[in-house]
Amino acid sequence: MEKEKKDDEKPDLENSVDFSEQFNQLELLKTHGHLIPTGTQSLWVGNSDEDEEQEEKNEEWYQLQEKKMEKDPSKLLLWAAEKNRLATVQRLLSEKAAEVNTRDEDEYTPLHRAAYSGHIDVVRELVAKGADVHAVTVDGWTPLHSACKWNNTKVASFLLQHDADINAQTKGLLTPLHLAAGNRDSRDTLELLLMNRYIKPELKNNSQETASDIARRTSIYHYLFEIAEGCTNSSPPS
């Protein structure tokens, strides 16, 4: 919420492809003329920005905050998920002190908070304990929307492997791709989404804009849409 307001099935890995973090698959497609095969999805693992995101707070400060919220386990779980307090999240869930899909006043779950903050270990723990990857906020945001808005590619990749809907639309008809397209630092997330054969880049928001329209206006990476065009949902010539 604070950050956002500034502006279960097992994963199907059989049909997935992994790739190095050091090269651009979309540009490889362009230079080699390859097509994305049916069922392909990226397992990009990315780099975590958790250390950079964390404020300069010492352990004593965090423990003091937790003590203040101890009588409200749901509030504590939401806070701990956002602040990357993995041990606290694990304790609350193991003690069943708080429900894994508890919500705040705007219907954000702990998974939403961990997703927009980029805390992959907390995300893994929450999903393992039954967190709903399809949960929506009052504005219709899923955890995948939250991850893609803030270019948390590692989290987005994990959520997609756990059945998150890549084409889910908010109440404003925004897809995760729309949100990534509006972020000037979103190259990694754009690559992840555009490499997924199930992506529907033609979907429009309530302003009748596609993600490509937004990227051309706001991002230096609009060319990624041009590279991906004709590759996704295609079959090699016979």
From Swiss-Prot:
Tissue: Expressed in spermatogonia, spermatocytes and round spermatids.
Chief location: nucleus
InterPro entries associated with the record: Ankyrin_rpt (IPR002110), Ankyrin_rpt-contain_sf (IPR036770)
Compartment(s): Nucleus
GO cellular component annotations of the record: nucleus
Keywords, in A-Z order: ANK repeat, Differentiation, Nucleus, Phosphoprotein, Repeat, Spermatogenesis
Entry-annotated residues carrying Phosphoserine: S48
UniProt keyword Kinase present: no
Ranges of Acidic residues composition bias in the record: 48-57
Chain segments carrying region Disordered: 38-57
Positions annotated as ANK repeat: 72-105, 106-135, 139-168, 172-205
Cross-referenced Gene3D superfamilies: Ankyrin repeat-containing domain
GO biological process: cell differentiation; positive regulation of DNA-templated transcription; spermatogenesis
Job of this protein: May have a role in spermatogenesis where it promotes autophagy in response to serum starvation, via the NF-kappaB pathway.
Name recorded for this polypeptide: Ankyrin repeat domain-containing protein 49
